[in-house]
């Protein structure tokens, strides 16, 4: 929640205004489309228009950007030299057709982009900008890779640093998402103490009724100890407590960072488990509208209660 997409879109917009040709890529179409939407919004705010193209699959709606300035093309040969912005996965930029055709290549979620893929598509640009957080989930890997060849692009660049050094990049140090009590723990545990919460985030809190579940707090991190044994991938005792907390949450209100009060709904809650067996069990006992999944399903998403 540090404005990665917003800042990236602003930088790309500035380069487009300067007449630079931009490439946008990532491991997934979802990540690419999210950044493209941010770029179009930034351009619309500034009344700036440009022509762009994204390599998509007409038979897969989830790959389509459906933009007002960035059109979808099924054939990469339909990308024109007039397109100041081109977007696609590594398969697009690794094609010799696009060698040295971009001034800048922006790679989103670079913590999940393999070094090999970056090298393959890097020939398309004179400059490469990596965007992401190597402390999030790493790239899925199958097989054995010698030396550092199995690293992600960000892992290779940062050489073990938890946060990017000033001489290698920009660290966005303000979260617009986390309450200060949560941010303090995350910052010290993961980000060298460099991450800080915006002051308005302190307004975010649950407005708990007197009968609320005792495991709930107005804000911050709550730990509930549950005694059980032999539950390596599925825990019914944990499921029972989660069901009670979920039901209690739906009877509460919350205050957002703007000071507005809302009723808690299932949309405001994320339930996360490391095991698919437990996820399936939780889905079977929680209301149908509950958002339940493993970490990889919800990475990058947010909710008032997790």
Regions of interest found by a model, annotated:
Residues 7, 11:
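Hydrophobic positions on the alpha1 helix immediately C-terminal to the Walker A/P-loop
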Residues 14-19, 26-34, 38, 90-107, ...:
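Conserved helicase motor core of SF1/SF2 NTP-dependent helicases
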Residues 21-24, 50-51:
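Conserved catalytic segments around the Walker B and adjacent sensor/switch elements
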Residues 41-94:
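Inter-Walker segment of RecA-like/P-loop motor cores
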Residues 3:
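Conserved glycine(s) of the Walker
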């Amino acid at each position: 929640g540090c404005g990665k997409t917003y800042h990236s879109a602003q930088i790309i917009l500035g380069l487009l205004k300067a007449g630079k040709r931009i490439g946008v890529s990532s491991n997934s179409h979802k990540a690419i489309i999210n950044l493209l939407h941010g770029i179009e919004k930034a351009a619309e705010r500034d009344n700036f228009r440009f022509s762009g193209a994204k390599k998509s699959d007409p038979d897969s709606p989830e790959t389509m950007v459906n933009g007002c300035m960035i059109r979808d093309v099924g054939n990469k040969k339909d990308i024109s030299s007039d397109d100041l912005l081109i977007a696609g996965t590594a398969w697009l930029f690794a094609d010799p057709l696009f060698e040295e055709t971009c001034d800048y290549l922006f790679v989103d979620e670079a913590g999940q982009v393999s070094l090999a893929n970056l090298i393959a598509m890097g020939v398309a640009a004179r400059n490469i900008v990596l965007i992401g957080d190597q402390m999030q989930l790493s790239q899925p890997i199958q097989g054995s890779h010698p030396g550092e060849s199995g690293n992600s692009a960000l892992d290779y660049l940062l050489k073990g640093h938890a946060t990017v050094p000033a001489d290698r990049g920009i660290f966005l140090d303000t979260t617009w998402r986390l309450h200060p009590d949560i941010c303090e723990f995350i910052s010290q545990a993961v980000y060298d103490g460099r991450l800080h919460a915006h002051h308005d985030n302190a307004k975010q809190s649950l407005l708990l009724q007197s009968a609320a579940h005792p495991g709930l707090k107005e804000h911050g991190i709550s730990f509930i100890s549950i005694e059980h044994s032999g539950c390596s991938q599925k825990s019914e005792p944990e499921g029972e407590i989660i069901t009670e907390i979920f039901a209690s949450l739906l009877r509460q209100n919350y205050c957002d960072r703007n000071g507005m009060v809302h009723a808690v709904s299932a949309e405001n809650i994320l339930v996360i488990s490391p095991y698919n067996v437990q996820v399936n069990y939780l889905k079977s006992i929680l209301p149908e509208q509950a958002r339940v999944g493993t970490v990889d399903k919800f990475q990058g998403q947010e909710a008032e209660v997790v």
